[in-house]
Amino acid sequence: MTASTSVAVGCAVGIPVGVGIIIAVCFWFNLQKRYKREEQDDRELERAIYDESGFVSFDNFGPLRDSKDEAALASSELKNPDHTSGSSEGSAHPEEKDGKSRDQEKPLGKKNSKYYVPAYRRKINLLQVRNNNYGNNARQKSVVDLPSINNSSNVSLSSSQRHITKRQISVYDQMVPVISDEGPKFFADPSSDTNTSNDQNKASMIELKHNTRQSSNENLIRKLQNQDFGSYYPRRASSSFLNGNISNASFHTRNSSITSVNKRDALEDVFATPKSAAQSQLPNTFDKDNEGIDADHSVKDSRSAITDKDKDIYKLQNNYDVGNIGEIAEEDQYENEFTNYSQSKREFIESLRPK
């Protein structure tokens, strides 16, 4: 009982597996044969491609013909009768030629259907077949239509020229157009084309280019002077009368004693903070019309005004001032009312004290 069961299971499993393995081996052998054929075809194609006479063009279909086609054409030429033969013999040749051409096309079609052929190889084969058919038809027409030997060469030449139209490359296909850069010369009147006019045109063009370049540079300078390059607070448009030492708000935002020594009567500093600007304007608050008043009264009034103002004005102290060289700088030299952290800290501490 157990033996019969094991035999049944072995047959049920082993027979299908064995048949499948045999079929797979057969397919594998067929595939290997196909790969070998394709490799051989590819080698032939590479040989034809790298051959100088094998390039595909409309003028050299002759080198692309196969040896079998050439042998068939040679045999057909040997079988052709003389041109002096009757019209009955010549009329029978087109049908025979058509039959032969069909017979030649059939094996090619069978070969394409039986074996795998790439698309570019199919195109080359079709071009070869068309060229062969066209040559056979041209020969048949020349044999049938020509009545005599004298007219045969002329008519065959004219028919071949009629059917085969080659495109001739002209000089204009290889010409590179070049246009001169000077506009007035290109559209100038030929009658007025003299040396003097050319010199005048050159001088006028040079002068025009120089003027345009100079005007563009001036406009650029004006735009750069009026632009605000990242200052902390909006400022007025800059003017050309400002001092050269004050270049930008990001570099000078303090009222230093070094710059204020030689600038008593200078214009308003647009880069200074409001508090420092008020301090710099203190010496200019005196009216010049009242210089005739007593010197003692004016000195006393100015001293009292300065002492009153100094209580409310916050002064930036740093090592860059002449007056406080020995002191240690406690504030940043680029501080203003927006970035004065020390003053804000002091105000905050004072606000915390009980009142």
Swiss-Prot record:
Region Disordered, annotated ranges: 70-114
Localization (cell): Cell membrane; Bud membrane
Composition bias type Basic and acidic residues, residue spans: 92-108
Topological domain ranges for the Extracellular compartment: 1-8
DNA repair in keyword set: no
Cytoplasmic side: 30-355
Bilayer topology term: Single-pass type III membrane protein
Gene Ontology CC: one annotated term: cellular bud membrane
Membrane-spanning residues: 9-29
Protein family according to the UniProt entry: Belongs to the SKG1 family.
Protein name: Suppressor of lethality of KEX2 GAS1 double null mutant protein 1
Biological source species: Saccharomyces cerevisiae (strain JAY291)
Organismal lineage: Eukaryota, Fungi, Dikarya, Ascomycota, Saccharomycotina
Gene behind the chain: SKG1
